[in-house]
Amino acid sequence: MSALARAVGISRQALYLHFPDRTQLMLALVAHVDEKEQLQAGIAAVTHAADAAGAIRAWAHMQTWHNPKIAALARALDETWHADPSASAARADRMADRMRGAVSIIERLRAEGRLDPTWTPAEAAVLLGELTSFHVWDDLVNDAQIPPDRYIEIITAAALSALGAPVSRVT
């Protein structure tokens, strides 16, 4: 906290007036970045999609414009969350929000009869969350150089194909 206070030109005490600890600071930081980068507009597009397939497509689309704006912060949290409880709390907060979004889409998919009954809702939500994760976007768009529009189509098709297909149960 001392280094951060020095970097922004305030006293450590002034920083603690606003944030009682690093965890609260990290949570405020990720919330601020999401607000500044208009994450709610992307979430609204997902929520208001005509059907579950449209919601998956809207979520993938949101990744193509939101992730470049948060890439530095997402990578920093990813590098530090295992060892830093404050970064871990900020990451857990974001992941919980993502999982709520995935669960909502899976509920729609199931209500529309497009989720194969061999999937549990929890398994399906985890898969959808992973397919639309920052890591998958980063690997496909940045490392593999897949154009963003193609990424949207690949993620949408992969999610719909996987979740509409039966899963064998291992006994």
Regions found by a protein language model. Name each.
Residues 22, 29, 33, 59, ...:
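Hydrophobic/aromatic residues within well-ordered alpha-helical segments
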Residues 64-78, 85-112, 122-126, 160-164:
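Amphipathic alpha-helical packing segments from all-alpha helical-bundle domains
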Residues 1-24, 28:
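Helix-turn-helix
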Residues 1, 30-37:
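Short, basic, alpha-helical segments at the C-terminal edge of helix-turn-helix-like DNA-binding modules
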Residues 24, 28, 41-69, 125:
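Hydrophobic alpha-helical connector segments
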Residues 3, 24, 58, 76, ...:
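Amphipathic alpha-helical interaction segments
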Residues 110-158, 166-171:
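Hydrophobic/aromatic-rich alpha-helical bundle segments in the mid-to-C-terminal region
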